[in-house]
């Protein structure tokens, strides 16, 4: 009986520890339906961080699974004025500690520089940093797909 109680207690602790908040914040004045394009900014500005390089690949994939069409930095100048009005610049950040990993992806209007949406994915079992990171990436990807659903 003690063993079952101990096992149940451990599973409950793991469950509670993994319950971190993933959420999306959308600007009150933003109409996300107006946006069709996205471009990652500051590409290759990682200062040697392998985690950020890995995150960029996975964030790019997540955005491609939404309705937003990815546009490279060099291709922005080829967009028409109307297309630039539908363009979001994408910035992201990764924070990790022993308890959890957090991945935040911010979407900023190209012309105004105003943040219109921020998606946050967090995950933490505290057992394996890479596992927590992958969990946070999956959660932020889910938030992006919900925020910019395919039509």
State where each predicted segment sits.
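Amphipathic beta-strand/beta-sheet edge segments enriched in Tyr/Trp
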Residues: 93-126
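Short, solvent-exposed, polar/charged sequence segments at loop or secondary-structure edges
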Residues: 53, 57-95, 99
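Solvent-exposed, acidic/flexible segments
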Residues: 48-56, 98-101, 126-137
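Structured loop/turn residues at beta-strand edges in well-structured enzyme cores
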Residues: 14, 33, 83-85
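A structural "domain/chain start" motif
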Residues: 17-68, 150-151
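Sec-dependent bacterial lipoprotein signal peptides
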Residues: 1-19
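C-terminal/domain-edge helix-coil "capping" segments
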Residues: 20-33, 65, 116-151
């Amino acid at each position: 009986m003690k063993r079952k109680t101990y096992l149940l207690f451990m599973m409950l602790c793991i469950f509670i520890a993994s319950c971190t908040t993933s959420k999306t914040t959308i600007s009150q004045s933003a109409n996300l339906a107006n946006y069709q394009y996205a471009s990652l900014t500051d590409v290759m500005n990682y200062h040697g961080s392998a985690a950020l390089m890995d995150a960029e690949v996975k964030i790019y994939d997540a955005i491609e699974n939404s309705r937003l069409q990815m546009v490279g930095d060099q291709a922005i100048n080829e967009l028409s004025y109307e297309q630039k009005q539908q363009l979001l610049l994408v910035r992201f950040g990764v924070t990790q500690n022993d308890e959890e990993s957090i991945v935040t992806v911010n979407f900023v209007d190209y012309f105004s520089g105003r943040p219109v949406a921020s998606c946050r994915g967090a995950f933490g079992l505290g057992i394996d940093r890479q596992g927590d990171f992958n969990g946070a990436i999956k959660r932020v990807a889910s938030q992006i797909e919900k925020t910019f659903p395919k039509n």
